[in-house]
Every structure is written in C-alpha cells, then in structure tokens.
Amino acid sequence: MKEPGGLSLAMIVKNEEMFLADCLRSVKDVVDEMVIVDTGSTDATIEIARSFGARVIEIEWPHDFSKARNIGLDAVSMPWVLVMDADEELVADDADKLRQAVFHPTADAYNIRIVSVMERAEDISESYVTRVMRAHPALRFRGAIHEQLFNAIVDAGMSLGQLDVRLTHKGYLGSVMQQRNKQERNRILLEEEVTKHPDDFYMLWQLAQTYFGTARYDDAIKISQRALKLSSPNSPLWVLAMTTYARSLLQAGQPKKARRVLQEGQLAHPKYTDFWYLEGVVLFQMKAWGQAEASFRRCLDIGEAQGYLATDTGIGGFKSLYRIAQCEIMQGEGKNALAYLLITIKQQPQYRSAWRAIFEILIGSTMGEVLNTIELSVGLDQIINTLSTWPQLDDNEQHLLECAKEKVQEQNLAGV
C-alpha cells in the first residue's frame, strides 16, 4: 500500500557525473524512492545513481524530453512525484516544506522556485516551474523540449498551487552550457517543435529565448511577434514573452520600440518589476539619465515581482540601487552615487561591479580611506570573506583585502 505522503524522485539523465551526486545527496532524506531514466550515459552516471539506491531504467534517447520523462513517471510507486534535473539541488532549508506539501496537500500539483545561478554570484534568476505533482496517469509531460505539465493539469481538471520550495540550478553556468552545447541542441529541437506546432505559444517563446541567447536578435524579434499574436496579457507567459521581445529589440538597436513594448507591458502589469527595470536600461542606453533613474526608483518602490513565473532576482533591490548610482554618476553626482553603491554592497556583498564603481569614485584616496568608507556599510569580516571568494582579484581588490586583513590584525593586537 502506498504511503499517503510518499514521494518519488523522477529524473532523466545522460553523462551527469559532474552534478548527480550533489543532486541526489540533497534529496536522499526527503524522497522515498529514486527513479532515474538514463538515456545512454558513458561516464559514471549510472554507478553514482545506484550508489544512492536509485532504480535506473536504461533507454535509447527518444529525441523527445517528454517521452523520456514520462517513462520515469510511469515507473514511480509513490503517490507524489518530485521531478528534478541532475544539475539541480534542493535547498536544505526547504525540505520540510516539501514534505508538508505532499503529506497535507492543498493542490494536485505545485510550482516551485528554480533559482538559476550564473558565473557571477549576483547574476541570479528565478522562475516557477511545475515539479511536484500527484502520480496520476493524466499528469504527463508534453513537448519534445522545454517539456511542461500545465496543459495536462488543466485538461485533467486538477488544481495547481505554488510552493516556496527552491531548487538551485547550475546548468546555465557558461562553462556547463559550452560543454553540453546546450543552446544548439535546444535550437534544433525547438525549431522542429515549432514546425510541427506553429501556433504553440509556449514553444514559440522558448525558441525566441534561444535565438536571443545566441545573439540572433532579428529572429528573436520575429518569433516573439508571432508568439504574442497568439496570447493576451491575461496569460501567465505573456509578460515573459514581452520581456524577451523588448530585450531583443534593444539588442537589435531599436531602443525606442523596445520602450514602447515595455510601456504596453507596464499598463497591463504595473507590478511586474522587470518591465520598469528594462525601461531603465533602455533609457540609460538612450542617455536619458534622469528618466532612467526614475524607472529604477520605481523598481525599488515595487520591490521584487511577486506572483509571476519568472523574474530577474535583485531588480527590486540591489540591482536597481546600482543602476541609480550609475545614473547619478552620469549626472555628475558622485557623492550621491557613492551612497547608493554602499547600500548596494550592503544588500548584496557579492555584487562585484558595485565594488569596482566605488574604487572609481574614490580614485585618488588612500586604500585606508577606501576601507574606512566601505566599512560604513560592510563590516571588516564581510569585506574579507567577500573578497576572498573572488577569483583573480584586480590590484584594487587585492590591496583592499590586504588592508582589511592588516586592520583586523592590528585590532587583535590592540585587544579590540
């Protein structure tokens, strides 16, 4: 008999020895079984999976992500399923929330937060994706790539909730993307899907995203326009397609048109911070410093976007503070800019660009004076811890680190 809140892990993998152990370790005390579909690994992936007690199903790659995922869903034995990728990890603090959600369910499926980390610590993005669901035969993935469950949930008359449970995702790190040739693979599969399903809004948007990611901005614009003709502001994905469209226009050298698109988005979704932030970026590129600053201030008023499927993390806080500082610099207000930069690194100490901007403003000051200024916002220990995590420090960063360490030693000797 199935345990009422039993939870299965379902995954598809191929040559994931780099990440798989960390992934499985993060959920081994949360899930009741692991079902892993391997599509042709030639490294240690299968051995790693079995070392965690996983049941491994070996298949040939069907050139369809949904088919592969659904083989795993067909094989689970628990009443609930957690779907993960090998380059993801469950945040330890969220384990109890996940268990509570399946033991005391309020919905038939849940969107959870995917937190994608990038090369730079401050470049984080978040999206909500359906990854927890009942093990019900009607709930099966659709789409050969960027497979999703939403339509299956709707067709089955089931409910979709939202959980504040996080998976960290490392797959968009530049080194990983390059190794896997991920974008080229995605492009081919998405173009095939769009040929088969020319009116599939979701696939069109994903193809536009892929074109944008490979600097094919004109193609991204055309596909975004096609997608948006099939949607309306009421669709959860509409705001995402609009931001892709606006970003593509900006990169293609059409900032005025990009702004018009963003203003249309603001009218429909005034609380979607990303529209205001991107407008600020557009206006900054147009050298309209005061107007750009007003847009970034609006981001601070709104805060992080709530209730949307994806947002650029930090634009309701430290990223907009940094952008305001840039606007102040361009308007000749260095002191104001410095104040905003100090608040920026207080909110997000890893925001390296802000530190470097501080060095630029304080050029001509001694490093001791720079350190004293930064200490108004960030403590000595935090300064040392932050700088120590960065690879290849430049001269200013190295000098500041040494200065901070010397000051700590002096304080220790003085018994402070």
Question: Can you annotate each of these PLM segments?
Answer:
Residues K67-L73, M84, L90-K222:
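Catalytic-site signature of metal-activated, phosphate-bearing donor transferases
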Residues I46-I71, A75:
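Conserved donor nucleotide-binding strand/loop of the catalytic core
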Residues S26, D38-R50, W61, D85:
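A conserved acidic beta->alpha catalytic loop
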Residues M18-A21, D43-F52, D93:
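Acidic helix N-cap motif at the loop->helix transition within catalytic regions
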Residues V81:
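Short aromatic/hydrophobic "clamp" motif used to bind/position activated sugar donors
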Residues A10-E33:
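Short, well-formed alpha-helical segments that are part of the catalytic scaffolds
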